[in-house]
């Protein structure tokens, strides 16, 4: 195997280890914070932290279990019996099991001098599912936890060391999950245009900078009006859920479980953009961007008209320039990315190759694993991929 290929396999293995470590670190900091809140008599805060952890974990296990049930028979040849897998998911260990399975397969293909096409495709299959689950966990648990911690700090006027650790790990975890998910989507495209270092940095930064003002706006509103933030989230979430439902998603293995995906996507859209339907994304992205921006402006107007100071005595005017600066810088970097670094800007499809023709069959002629869930999403995110995949094979 060429050194470049072995280097790519090693890079994927290291990224898998780092992703799993980041998940465990984030989980540990959340549990640490919950214990500290309980010891300090802040039982409501501790209960909120644990509730967010529990809800996100249950959703993650449901996704994982439904996907495992729908995977082709015999695909996961060395996995435990179905009853053991069901028990693992019931104990909230299904996601960690998948992480271990991915790392084991990644180590296997890296150690082989000439890994088979099946082993390589199976490693990609596992990594793509992990990437999707990590994204769901990020917006179901990490982003709400980050908002909660910021609201607690702003309301109390104190910042404990474990809270700073939680904030740092949350921001990095969210941006990492978005970057890893976007990188995974690119591997599903016909020409497999991987993210370079420059485009990775730009993509990482614009997601971080645009997410920060949104989280800050909701956190400040929560600190000033803790009794109304749940109503605000529920009202906005229902509108976003209706929008997702009207787009007719078909991501899950069967229609009866599609609701889980739709409610999760509606939660993601509360914080960030996520494309769920076929067709050109620019119009939908602009509508969502304007909707979220209008909501954040209304939150800011609510602060200004009701109070100029937080309960902790911190003037709100100190936070507004920070949020605005991050927003405009993130918006500029987003425009740079989509104008010069997006795959559609330098699309170089192979006209002799149809999407899937390369990856569905091995040289020996047997079927290779293909993660149709992520391939479908990649075609939604990058419409040109579907257009090029539909080209007839020449020759």
From Swiss-Prot:
Biological process, per Gene Ontology: apoptotic process involved in development; engulfment of apoptotic cell; neutrophil clearance; phosphatidylserine exposure on apoptotic cell surface; positive regulation of myoblast differentiation
InterPro entries, per database record: XK-rel (IPR018629), XK-related_scramblase (IPR050895)
Regulation of protein activity: Activated upon caspase cleavage to generate the XK-related protein 8, processed form. Does not act prior the onset of apoptosis.
Any Pfam family hit: XK-related
GO cellular component terms attached to this protein's record: perinuclear region of cytoplasm; plasma membrane
Highest rank taxon of the organism: Eukaryota
Site description Cleavage, residues in chain: 355-356
Topology, Cytoplasmic side: 1-12, 69-158, 222-223, 280-284, 334-395
The entry's keywords: Apoptosis, Cell membrane, Cytoplasm, Membrane, Phosphoprotein, Transmembrane, Transmembrane helix
Annotated positions of the Phosphothreonine modification: 375
Modified residues (Phosphoserine): 362
Compartment(s): Cell membrane; Cytoplasm, Perinuclear region
Post-translational modification remark: Undergoes proteolytic processing by caspase-3 (CASP3), leading to its activation. Phosphorylation at Thr-375 activates the phospholipid scramblase activity.
PANTHER family xref list: XK-RELATED PROTEIN, XK-RELATED PROTEIN 8
Quaternary structure annotation from Swiss-Prot or TrEMBL: Interacts with BSG and NPTN; which act as chaperones to localize XKR8 at the cell membrane.
Family recorded in the similarity comment: Belongs to the XK family.
UniProt-recorded name of the protein: XK-related protein 8
Classification lineage: Eukaryota, Metazoa, Chordata, Craniata, Vertebrata
